[in-house]
UniProtKB/Swiss-Prot annotation:
The active site is at S122 (charge relay system), D176 (charge relay system), H210 (charge relay system). It comes from Homo sapiens. It comes from the Eukaryota. Transmembrane segments: none annotated. This is Acyl-protein thioesterase 2. The gene is LYPLA2. GO terms for biological process: acylglycerol catabolic process; axon guidance; fatty acid metabolic process; prostaglandin catabolic process; protein depalmitoylation.
Length: 231
């Protein structure tokens, strides 16, 4: 990893997948509640593009209200998983700032904002949506898997002006018992009020629960190939 990572705590021990060629683009992917970046680094290595660097940071360990205050990797506190559940606004905003610092570190190392995709699964996907929509830098797009938009009532007003050009791939399992697919559909509807509607893809997968599947990973690869072509 080139550059000073000490000022970006999430980078110091992040799981990374290096490109086989000169890296001209980056995907920052955020794991779900209770997980680490390693599992998604492994998954993304199966669809890697040779000129893309994949960065999968680990969330800090904090008490999570939803899980009886058990301490576990979590980007912010979770009180519930429904559109009207109370939210940890301060924690969400702080986590987003930490991800923006990671984005800016990559930019300083020569990867322009429009060659950076932010993505994530479940809570990580939620944070990637919030961060990208409020980011002052015009990113290439978002990969949002099995997730929702945090603080959704603040949008579209809370979005940065450059957010309207973001490309978004949103995927959801139709049998998801944790984050119901209906919540995903409401999120897609809200996203179309924030970005150019035609730039939001919402794909659902029959028989899939709160997890990924090969068809979804193929869709992610196709999305990244179009958004981050070789230069």
């Amino acid at each position: 990893m080139c550059g000073n990572t000490m000022s970006v705590p999430l980078l110091t021990d992040a799981a990374t997948v290096s490109g086989a060629e000169r890296e001209t683009a980056a995907v920052i992917f955020l794991h779900g509640l209770g997980d680490t970046g390693h599992s998604w680094a492994d998954a993304l290595s199966t669809i890697r593009l040779p000129h893309v660097k994949y960065i999968c940071p680990h969330a800090p360990r904090i008490p999570v209200t939803l899980n009886m205050k058990m301490v576990m990797p979590s980007w912010f506190d979770l009180m519930g998983l429904s559109p009207d559940a109370p939210e940890d606004e301060a924690g969400i905003k702080k986590a987003a700032e930490n991800i923006k610092a990671l984005i800016e570190h990559e930019m300083k190392n020569g990867i322009p904002a429009n060659r950076i995709v932010l993505g994530g699964f479940s809570q990580g996907g939620a944070l990637s949506l919030y961060t990208a929509l409020t980011c002052p830098h015009p990113l290439a797009g978002i990969v949002a898997l099995s997730c929702w938009l945090p603080l959704h009532r603040a949008f579209p007003q809370a979005a940065n002006g450059s957010a309207k050009d973001l490309a978004i791939l949103q995927c959801h399992g139709e049998l998801d018992p944790m984050v119901p697919v209906r919540f995903g559909a409401l999120t897609a509807e809200k996203l179309r009020s924030v970005v150019t509607p035609a730039r939001v893809q919402f794909k659902t997968y029959p028989g899939v629960m709160h997890s990924s599947c090969p068809q979804e990973m193929a869709a992610v690869k196709e999305f990244l190939e179009k958004l981050l072509p070789p230069v």
